[in-house]
From Swiss-Prot:
GO terms for molecular function: auxin efflux transmembrane transporter activity; identical protein binding; protein homodimerization activity. It is a multi-pass membrane protein. Induction: Down-regulated by endoplasmic reticulum stress treatment. It comes from Arabidopsis thaliana (Mouse-ear cress). The chain crosses the membrane at residues 8-28, 39-59, 71-91, 102-122, 132-152, 477-497, 501-521, 536-556, 562-582, 596-616. Keywords: Auxin signaling pathway, Cell membrane, Developmental protein, Membrane, Phosphoprotein, Transmembrane, Transmembrane helix, Transport. Residues 312-334 have a biased composition (Polar residues). The lineage of its organism: Eukaryota, Viridiplantae, Streptophyta, Embryophyta, Tracheophyta. This is Auxin efflux carrier component 4. Residues 302-343, 390-411 are annotated as: Disordered. GO terms for cellular component: cell periphery; mitochondrion; plasma membrane.
Length: 616
């Protein structure tokens, strides 16, 4: 029977964690002590130092030779049951998908054991429960988070193949991933070079695109180009290594540059005199267009009649060409469409380089559509200009991404990218851009995947590159190795090293909760995914997870306090690491965010209810 003293002991252990979280929340939302940049620095410290050292402290001080294998087996069986059920649902039903499989698996089986579980379970069931929680933490860090990464990278590899090789994926026999590609999460533009070997099979090389590399070296200029910038090969046309004489010849000048100001000055409404910086959030599309000086000999209209071109090309062939000159009739067509569009309309520039001679009109249906303004082809270089309105377009796109600039980030991006990819026929030097797909990873069910061994090797390479950059990987492995050595030969850690670690690990628990409070304060809404989806997520977290754990525990033979500890541990709030992965790979991040934030708020009363009911 649970007494009031037992409840007070639990509250004594848990309430201080919530105090740290509330202080952090108030520091941002109420008192405005920390700016978002400062919050980012604190979170960085917690992620790199505090939490890894906290993990190392708990793992290295836990005796691995005294593990309760029955308890560990029950925890493992719970996760295997959920994984098998979700895999069957995803593959055998129409509503199933890989994304929902990953999300439900994260919600139901991966709780916040390190930060919340250890102090809570120690207060409820004693120090032995804390030792069991450490065993769960070891398995989470080494096995289950790695499996989660594997699933996310499998999704990324599947999307890559579906986008780039929709009909020839089964012919791929090898992938070579260049060293600067860390993940297939879609944050970087990627290129694929496919070479046909002597056996007629495809050998694919995956690398970062030139645009992605250049973007790391440039400070992008804030722009009002909303969602259309996603498709530009650079985030801004203002800074580049473009040949300025070519640029001026296109604009109608007979010679090279006529002054010491560049394209950034021309298209910015800010003065170039003095140290005034270029970035501005002024709506330049709504302002008066300032063009070049009048030139009577020019056969091209004034520069103010059409916007600045994007002077950067993505080349897959190594051949350079000059930009295409625009015929008068197409310029008039641009002017007419610009006058008809609303003042919020944006123009999308797409420069596509292809070794194929197929015209752009083959992709865009002859160019007679409302969106296509101009198209030319000179030595394989094609320019596509598309007027993109801020108003949402009617489309059959499925959900799975935010609507940016009137284009659904799932279907709209794939639609345009498939068009550009269609310009490049499959050959020995074909290249294509990989853009991050939306939340829905479903697609062409007829797409054939490469052999399992090829896919597995690609995914393992990417998972390995992610793991070796994660401090928690090192802290967990080193802590486990030290525990195996220390408890086998009774070796003590040197005092200097022990104190150096403990001074930071002691702050790890409070800093982790403080960081969580900062994260909550920076979110626009506590429930970001809608009430119905949030209710479903909470039901999976606090009902389905403990129920499956009870079934697994009884099947293994747990009883008494061991079974109670297993069930309460499964009812802890959502773990933070699955949310971080969901954010990186853009797979239902709002659901995991709600699971972390709202779950943390309601976790204490729910775990207390489980504690009281199981103690009856």
């Amino acid at each position: 029977m649970i007494t009031w003293h037992d409840l007070y002991t639990v509250l004594t252990a848990v309430v201080p964690l919530y105090v740290a979280m509330i202080l952090a929340y108030g520091s941002v939302q109420w008192w405005k002590i920390f700016s978002p940049d400062q919050c980012s620095g604190i979170n960085r410290f917690v992620a790199i130092f505090a939490v890894p050292l906290l993990s190392f402290h708990f793992i290295s001080t836990n005796d691995p030779y005294a593990m309760n294998f029955r308890f560990v087996a029950a925890d493992t069986l719970q996760k295997i049951i959920m994984l098998v059920l979700l895999a069957l649902w995803a593959n055998l039903t129409k509503n199933g998908s890989l994304e929902w499989m990953i999300t439900i698996f994260s919600l139901s089986t991966l709780p916040n054991t390190l930060v919340m579980g250890i102090p809570l379970l120690i207060a409820m069931y004693g120090t032995y429960a804390g030792s069991l929680m450490v065993q769960v933490v070891v398995l989470q860090c080494i096995i289950w988070y790695t499996l989660l990464l594997f699933l996310f990278e499998y999704r990324g590899a599947k999307l890559l193949i579906m986008e780039q090789f929709p009909e020839t994926g089964a012919s791929i026999v090898s992938f070579k991933v260049e060293s600067d590609v860390v993940s297939l999460d879609g944050h970087d533009f990627l290129e694929t070079d496919a070479e046909i070997g002597n056996d007629g099979k495809l050998h694919v090389t995956v690398r970062k695109s030139n645009a992605s590399r250049r973007s790391l070296m440039m400070t992008p200029r804030p722009s009002n180009l909303t969602g259309a910038e996603i498709y530009s090969l650079s985030s801004t046309p203002r800074g580049s290594n473009f040949n300025h004489s070519d640029f001026y010849s296109v604009m109608g000048f007979p010679g090279g540059r006529l002054s010491n100001f560049g394209p950034a000055d021309l298209y910015s409404v800010q003065s170039s005199r003095g140290p005034t910086p270029r970035p501005s959030n002024f709506e330049e599309n709504n302002a008066v267009k300032y063009g070049f000086y009048n030139n009577t000999n020019s056969s091209v209209p004034a520069a103010g009649s059409y916007p600045a071109p994007n002077p950067e090309f993505s080349t897959g062939t190594g051949v350079s060409t000059k930009p295409n000159k625009i015929p008068k009739e197409n310029q008039q067509q641009l002017q007419e469409k610009d006058s008809k569009a609303s003042h919020d309309a944006k123009e999308l520039h797409m420069f596509v380089w292809s070794s194929s001679a197929s015209p752009v009109s083959d992709v865009f249906g002859g160019g007679a559509g409302d969106n296509v303004a101009t198209e030319q082809s000179e030595q394989g270089a094609k320019e596509i200009r598309m007027v993109v309105s801020d108003q949402p377009r009617k489309s059959n796109a499925r959900g799975g991404g935010d609507d940016i600039g009137g284009l659904d980030s799932g279907e709209g991006e794939r639609e345009i990218e498939k068009a550009t990819a269609g310009l490049n026929k499959m050959g020995s030097n074909s290249t294509a851009e990989l853009e991050a797909a939306g939340g829905d990873g479903g697609g062409n069910n007829g797409t054939h995947m490469p052999p399992t061994s090829v896919m597995t090797r690609l995914i393992l390479i990417m998972v390995w590159r992610k793991l070796i950059r994660n401090p928690n990987t090192y802290s967990s492995l080193i802590g486990l190795i030290w525990a195996l050595v220390a408890y086998r030969w009774h070796v003590a850690m040197p005092k200097i090293l022990q104190q150096s670690i403990s001074i930071l690990s002691d702050a790890g628990l409070g800093m982790a909760m403080f960081s969580l409070g900062l994260f909550m304060a920076l979110q626009p809404k506590i429930i970001a995914c809608g009430n119905s989806v949030a209710t479903f997520a909470m039901a999976v977290r606090f009902i389905t997870g403990p129920a499956i754990m009870a079934v697994a525990g009884i099947a293994i033979g747990l009883h008494g306090d061991l079974l109670r500890i297993a069930i309460v541990q499964a009812a802890l709030p959502q773990g933070i690491v699955p949310f971080v992965f969901a954010k990186e790979y853009n797979v239902h991040p709002t659901i995991l965010s709600t699971g972390v934030i709202f779950g943390m708020l309601i976790a204490l009363p729910i775990t207390l209810v489980y504690y009281i009911l199981l103690g009856l």
